[in-house]
């Protein structure tokens, strides 16, 4: 689901993941507000729909450590195949029982764990943001939940002037949430600014942070 762009070849790219079972619902409406703003800033965008097919949770089989791919060959592997070409990510979700949609949780659990165990480093130092859509409540708990994937993966988290949420029962409702849509536009501009700063830093020869071998310490030994 590619957004229409008129951008230069080689432009930086942000993948926006729609974690809703509704491909063109409230979450999509918020993501498109961001996508259009990113395009205006010269950033290419792609909407990735996780779809409505059942997505299994991680079964800790460690197949990803051996093959670099999840043992369940579905939308997770399709996403990981294109993630390397992205410069930034946005993950959008509706609120279900004051938390993220179950399918998106399974999707992100497996995507991020596969990346960790395989050593592919598809997300390392790439900016990320989450977008949350609700009819009424549960948004901040869901916002915190999704951000935890980024902050355990060395991904700079992009913020806006308010927590990244929109409200509405239908896409038409979301379009009336003027503050929510403004929050999406500011979020997109902040991400575009960060991407341009990162690109300028790399071109200027600013080195990436020194890497350390990861140390694991179990609480109970």
List the model feature ranges, each with a label.
Residues 53-80, 216-220:
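Cysteine-cluster motifs in flexible loop/terminal segments that predominantly coordinate metals
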Residues 71-162:
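Helix-loop-strand module that forms the ligand-binding subsite of alpha/beta enzymes
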């Amino acid at each position: 689901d590619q957004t229409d762009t008129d951008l230069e070849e080689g432009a930086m790219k942000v993948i926006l993941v729609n974690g809703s079972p509704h491909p063109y619902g409230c979450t999509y409406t918020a993501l498109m507000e961001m996508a259009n703003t990113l395009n205006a800033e010269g950033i290419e965008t792609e909407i990735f729909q996780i779809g409505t097919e059942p997505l299994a949770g991680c079964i800790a089989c460690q197949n990803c450590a051996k093959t670099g791919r999840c043992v369940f060959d579905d939308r997770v592997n399709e996403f990981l195949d294109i993630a390397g070409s992205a410069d930034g990510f946005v993950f959008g979700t509706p609120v279900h029982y004051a938390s993220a949609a179950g399918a998106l949780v399974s999707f992100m659990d497996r995507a991020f764990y596969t990346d960790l165990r395989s050593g592919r480093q598809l997300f390392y130092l790439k900016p990320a943001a989450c977008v949350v859509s609700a009819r009424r409540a549960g948004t901040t708990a869901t916002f915190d939940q999704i951000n935890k994937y980024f902050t355990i993966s060395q991904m700079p988290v992009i913020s806006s002037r308010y927590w990244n949420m929109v409200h509405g029962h239908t896409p038409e409702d979301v379009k009336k949430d003027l503050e929510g849509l403004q929050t999406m536009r500011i979020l997109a501009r902040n991400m575009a600014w960060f991407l341009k700063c990162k690109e300028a830093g790399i071109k200027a020869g600013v080195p990436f942070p020194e890497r350390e071998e990861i140390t694991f310490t179990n609480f109970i030994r």
